Amino acid sequence: MSRIGKKPVKIPAGVEVNIEGNTVTVKGPKGKLTRQFPAEITISREGEELQVSRPSDAKPHRALHGLSRALLQNMVDGVTRGFEKGLELVGVGYRAAKQGNKLVLSVGYSHPVEMVPGEGLEIEVPAPNKVIVKGIDKEAVGALAAKIRDVRPPEPYKGKGIKYEGEYIRRKVGKTGAKGGKK
């Protein structure tokens, strides 16, 4: 059995779980999430725990087993604690600002780049060179953070760009002075 899949998902106090066929709805203090799970996977409630099971030991079923359990755990964590992803802007004149619910990035282009967060997502700008994406859906938080990073990914020579908090940028040595050539 999958080591991750066989662990039960604990339902904390204040969280309501509704299972209808292969659709699971989780309601908590921060919001509500609904997800459709593969038909092969069975999700059952046993007291204050959710158990995920699979029909056979076939490789696709084993993969779906662990995945489904992890997605279910992320739903429960999202509606109780929420998720956040931090980004840092590195570079002279690179800065972020919030206008209404839009994020405006000045990252060396001839124009500022505007981004609108999706539903259920929130963007904070605690400092001009720092952006925090918050939400209850881990997948959506990560996707928006990746989209912001893709506006100006970090480059390996000077390390300028938008990077995740704590991300290590592998640096390269630049070209050395002119050597030889025609006279």
Swiss-Prot record:
Q: Which PROSITE patterns match?
A: RIBOSOMAL_L6_1
As recorded in UniProt, coiled-coil segments are none
Q: Which Gene3D superfamilies match?
A: Ribosomal protein L6, alpha-beta domain (3.90.930.12)
The Gene Ontology terms for molecular function here are: rRNA binding; structural constituent of ribosome
Q: Name one GO biological process term.
A: cytoplasmic translation
One Pfam family of this protein, by short name?
Answer: Ribosomal_L6
User: Which keywords has UniProt assigned to this entry?
Assistant: Ribonucleoprotein, Ribosomal protein, RNA-binding, rRNA-binding
Q: Which GO CC terms are listed, alphabetically?
A: cytosolic large ribosomal subunit
Highest taxon, organism lineage: Bacteria
Question: InterPro entries from the entry?
Answer: Ribosomal_uL6-like, Ribosomal_uL6-like_a/b-dom_sf, Ribosomal_uL6_a/b-dom, Ribosomal_uL6_bac-type, Ribosomal_uL6_CS
What is the documented function of this protein? This protein binds to the 23S rRNA, and is important in its secondary structure. It is located near the subunit interface in the base of the L7/L12 stalk, and near the tRNA binding site of the peptidyltransferase center.
- What do we know about how this protein assembles, alone or with others? Part of the 50S ribosomal subunit.
- Xref: PANTHER family: 60S/50S RIBOSOMAL PROTEIN L6/L9, LARGE RIBOSOMAL SUBUNIT PROTEIN UL6M
Q: Which family does it belong to?
A: Belongs to the universal ribosomal protein uL6 family.
Know the name of this protein? Large ribosomal subunit protein uL6
What is this protein's gene name? rplF
